[in-house]
């Protein structure tokens, strides 16, 4: 009897986080940063994060940890709660737009 080999790791293209919240959080961070006239590198430095990592966060390619969210919020001069409320607002708007689109398609 042959032993069945199970592939290790996650499937190609799979992520360990939900993409929509990551995209929304990144969009909020980018919008606040640009509204404040702060460059990505400056924000990353103030938050103690590599610039390339900050870019991944803003593009929704990485979901930051709670500690990182707190540092980003502090660097933006805002609370983590404000960032998360804005993120929830973006997600809600996207969900409403999808519902309206589906309703008009029917």
Language model regions located:
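Short alpha-helical DNA-recognition segment
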Residues: 37-56
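DNA-binding alpha-helical recognition surfaces that contact promoter or target DNA
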Residues: 27, 31, 45, 56, ...
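Hydrophobic micro-packing sites on short alpha-helices
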Residues: 68-73, 83-84
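Short C-terminal boundary/hinge segments that cap the last helix of small helical domains
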Residues: 77-93
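Residues that mark the N-terminal boundary/hinge immediately upstream of a DNA-recognition element
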Residues: 28, 39, 65-68, 79
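N-terminal flexible/basic segments that precede or flank functional cores
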Residues: 1-31, 35-36, 41, 74, ...
